[in-house]
Structures are given as C-alpha cells and as structure tokens.
Amino acid sequence: MNKIEALIEQYCPEGIEFKDLREVAKISNGKDHKYLEAGNYPVYGSGGIMRYVNQFIYNVESVLIPRKGSIGNIFYVSEPFWTVDTIFYTKIDRRSITPKFLYYYLKTLDLTELNFAGGVPSLTKTILDRISIPIPPLPVQEEIVNILDKFTTLEAELEAELEARKTQYEFYRNQLLNFEGKDVEWKTLGEIGVFIRGNGLQKKDFTSSGVGCIHYGQVYTLYGIYAYSTKTFVSNDFAKKLKKAKKGDLIIAATSENVEDVCKAVAWLGDNQIAISGDAFIFRHNQNPKFIAYYFKTNSFFENKKRFATGTK
C-alpha cells in the first residue's frame, strides 16, 4: 500500500466525496486593464501574462480558467494578479480544497469538450460550476500536490536539459559541416543528382494500408533526418500514378508557410519504393543520403536557401 492509499484508508475509508466546482470555489470575472498604469502585478489573459500593472484584482492563491480563446490554458497563481475579461479567476474555499489540488485536477480535464460556441472556443460560469471535483481529505490533497510538484520540477529540469542538448547538437552539427575556407571540392546539387517533382497525392488519398507515401507537409511535421518507414499509405492502384522515391533518395518539401521549412529534407532509407506528393521533390543522387540530409539542416545551407527562396505557400 502506497502513502496515498494509506491516507485514503485512514481519512476516508468509505470513499472519496465529489462536489460541484461551485461548492468549493466562486468563479469571478476579470476586468479591463487598459486604464491601469504599469507596475509589478501580472495581467493574465487566456494566453498567459499580457503585461504588468500597478493594481491587483485578487491577492489570494487562485486558479485561473479561460472564458474564451485558449480554454485549455489553466493557470495556478500564488501572488497578487489582475485578470482580463477573457479569463475567470476563482475564490477557493480552502477549508474544502487546496488551490493547487484544484489546479492539478482541472488540468486532467479536457475543457474543450465543454465548449459551447461554434466560433471562438468559450466557457460559461454555469458550465464550469457543474464540473464534478473529487474532495479527498486535505492531508490526502496535500500529499498528492507534493508528489505532482516534484514531477513538475523534474519535467522542467528535463526540458531544460533537452533544450541545452539540442543547442549543443546544433552547434556541433554546424561546426562539423562547415567547410567554408577549407580545401574541399564544392558542387551544386544539380551536379551530384537530379530532381524529380512529385505529383497528384493529397491527404484525402491516404488509406490504412497499401504503398507507403509521404506528403510534403509531413516532411516538416512528422519526420526527422531520415526514415525507414512511412506514417501513411495509398492504395496500390493509386500508387501506380505517382512518382516514387527509392532507397537513398531525399524527399524535399518544396513549399511551406515559412522559409525555415522550405527545402526541409528527409532521407528515405527503407527498402521499398514510396509515393511522393506534389509540392515535394525527390532528389536522386550518388552521395551518402544521411550526410546530405544533415547538411540541409545547417546554417550554411539555410543562408544559401534564403537567397533563392521566391516566396512561401
């Protein structure tokens, strides 16, 4: 029996009580902030902190729940704050529930399922008031919060470490693949290979099985430097109409909404040929496919690419 189970057995052997949110917290509206002067108190909207002002709307621990817009963005605040009219704040009955326990529980819910609007996602007090909240005894709540806080800290540390490693990787990749001023032979892509434009494939053509395929949009959303298998397929009959990439080819996105993703490339290392969509190129060459794909990610290639990019999607 773990500590949480032991506490539940000790304090609520008959089970955990549930209450509507309105029974443990009063939901309050935010207000306009435009007339306020600059200061030290954060102003929250549904997207997060917007600015800092010289007044606060509430100065007690609270959970902020968006009313409109990014309704999944729930915030826990422990310092004085101001909220605008797109986000609710809560006055919590601490005799029944700890604010952070309420925050963690609400984060487990998909509030978008409670959206009542057809346009901009929206929530109302009436809808939120009816949310059922588990109310274990306060010692149980505090232990749960303590455990989740530790995992939150660990997650933040791991994210920071991952970001540091990513920066380190990008630095060494650019250094290792920087041949400017060095005694190496330079050739254009056209001198080492040929470009074959894809054709005809749209997302609506995907099937659950068949011939593997890569749509140009997937090159910068689903794939890394190289791939041995595809995420999607087309029927055998439809595949006969499409251009195919074979092992060692690069698949290059020819268009994007930003210059960073234009010419994003994935090296195809699978044994079977795969179908390619329009707005993508197959680059067929006699070089190391991973080397070429890695080079496509360097700062040097990016700067050259910017010179030739004629527009975005």
Language-model-detected regions and their locations in the chain:
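Amphipathic alpha-helical segments
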Residues: 1, 15-17, 129-166, 170, ...
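Accessory (non-catalytic) regions of SAM-dependent nucleic-acid methyltransferases
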Residues: 1-11, 68
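Intrinsic, low-complexity N-terminal interaction/targeting segments
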Residues: 5, 33-35, 71-78, 87, ...
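Non-catalytic DNA-recognition/assembly elements of restriction-modification systems
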Residues: 10-43, 179-199
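Short, structured motif recognition centered on aromatic/hydrophobic residues
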Residues: 16, 41, 103, 148-151, ...
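DNA target-recognition patches
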Residues: 22-71, 202-235, 246
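A short beta-sheet element
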Residues: 45-107, 116-119, 124, 215, ...
